[in-house]
């Protein structure tokens, strides 16, 4: 069923970094990955224009050559991506065209932290993008109360999973990241043990 969907919603936000890491590790060379994290403390700044502009910037940064239509758009706006130089409709149009030529994963974390009015615009924009971009897939995370909004705005193309990570999974992820630390002496054994004990217990109970 999920294979037929273009949007995957996880109503647990605790493993979003695991999903993004897996996508980055396993993605083919011609696959683009762009991510955005909503933060409650930055709600006013994280408008639909800024959010989608950030995704566009990431996708464009991964291209070997910037398409002419994007160059011309920014010559006209003379502003940075996600800024006031481009309107939301223009950014959506640029994403439609750019994503239509390559396989892309858009990862949007903590959608529930987005202002409700902004969230509806974001979802409507994403649906518009998906209509024109057959090879684009969207990974969303958010608390359960936004599920209705998402399934309504992205009706027929959303699969929802509720996932609760196990302590062992979280411990393994933390252990792997600590082992990759390029400066292991910066953390003493007591702090490391505390991290490996408390974080898995706390997250698995959320």
Segments (PLM) and residue ranges:
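Conserved NB-ARC/NACHT P-loop NTPase core of NLR-like innate immune receptors
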Residues: 1-206
């Amino acid at each position: 069923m999920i294979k037929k969907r273009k949007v995957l919603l996880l109503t647990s936000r605790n493993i979003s970094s695991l999903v993004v890491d897996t996508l980055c590790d396993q993605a083919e060379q011609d696959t683009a990955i762009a991510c955005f994290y909503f933060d409650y403390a930055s709600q006013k700044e994280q408008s639909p224009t800024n959010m989608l502009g950030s995704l566009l910037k990431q996708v464009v940064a991964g291209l070997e050559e910037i398409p002419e239509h994007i160059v011309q758009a920014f010559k006209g706006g003379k502003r940075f991506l996600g800024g006031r130089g481009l309107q939301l409709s223009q950014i959506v149009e640029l994403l439609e065209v750019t994503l239509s030529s390559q396989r892309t994963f858009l990862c949007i974390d903590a959608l529930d932290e987005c202002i409700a009015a902004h969230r509806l615009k974001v979802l409507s924009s994403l649906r518009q993008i998906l209509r024109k971009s057959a090879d684009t897939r969207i990974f969303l995370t958010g608390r359960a109360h936004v599920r209705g909004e998402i399934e309504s705005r992205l009706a027929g193309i959303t699969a929802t999973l509720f996932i609760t990570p196990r302590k062992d999974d979280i411990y393994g992820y933390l252990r792997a990241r600590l082992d990759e630390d390029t400066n292991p002496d910066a953390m003493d054994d007591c702090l490391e043990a505390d991290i490996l004990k408390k974080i898995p217990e706390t997250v698995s109970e959320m």
